[in-house]
């Protein structure tokens, strides 16, 4: 932000302009006039401010050299004051003579120009001289302290106008940045809510899949129970059929061989005992099947070891059945004739076929259960791995986003710190330059004030003319500021500026 320049009239000093006197009159001068002009320049030389370019150059006249070679007289303060007054009077006298001579020459030249028509070259030269004089006059006016002060005020007014525009632009940029930050925060919140919704949807889907899997599993258990009941009914029907067949054989045997009643009775008793034993085995089988169902339900949640035990148990039952069947067959062979043997053989083969079919179904069912359990275990393992992978991915994304926001904030803080340090450095440098300028201006103003006091009444008339000129310049510069669009509050200081004579 530009700092407000001092309002105490401080300004940078520039080298004074010197105008070629030949621009104001004829080009020919007498030798005496040239000598007087040189003498006038010698007397006025102490009052001229040396420009920075001329500080290393010293011009000595013959009189100065002679004076420097002479012995330095010891002068009192009164002698110094008297010498200054004498030199001042002589200088004023020479200036008056030179001015009168210049006015006379200008008047003669004007009369001569009026009598003789100007040539084209003279017209061009006059235009060039007028432009040069106008430029020189403008430069001389611009070197005046009040005009420099006005220029400083104009520069300050333009600077603060630009500063206000920059401040307004900065406010707008900050507002846009805040709006953009709010938009980014809203987008991040929306993304976070979407991620949560997706996670909840996946959780709901997972729960639904588990529920469906449990329902399918329950339905399979029910289906197996129905299949077991159906198989049990089939086995009961087969047993009833076998009993009927045995009864038929017994009746035929009683009709055909009355003499074998005792043997038949014994056979019936043996069959009854066998039936009783088979009923007991059936009840035991039911108990074992119930236990087997419980083991299957528990096996769904545990391992495959129980299936092997179940297979061994079934194998043992099958062997017992085969042994019992062989025993019955031996008994029937002893009690029946050839036809009975054939019928018994057919019944035994039928029973063995049914037993083999039952064992194959049991084995296929066990294999299906094992395959289903393996698939469930694989699905559960894959689901857990997917869930862990998803959590790891979400954690990685959150960490990346956090590090990105942290890097952006650090970069922004570093930029703001650099801007603050640069601004402080510029302000400090500007302050030092301004203080040096103020001090230099203060010293220069003291010197100029001393010079103004020495000039006294002789310069009052010129000061009044200059005041009027400065007022015109002030009005012109106010018009320039108004045309440049500078607000009235920044033109007020220049408007209030008082032009003192």
Curated annotation (Swiss-Prot):
Disulfide bonds: none annotated. One of its GO terms (cellular component) is motile cilium. Its main location: other. It holds the Pfam family TPH. It is found in: Cell projection, Cilium, Flagellum. It comes from the Eukaryota. Keywords: Cell projection, Cilium, Coiled coil, Flagellum. Residues 75-114 form a coiled coil. InterPro entries: CFAP45, TPH_dom. Belongs to the CFAP45 family. This is Cilia- and flagella-associated protein 45. It comes from Chlamydomonas reinhardtii. The gene is CFAP45.
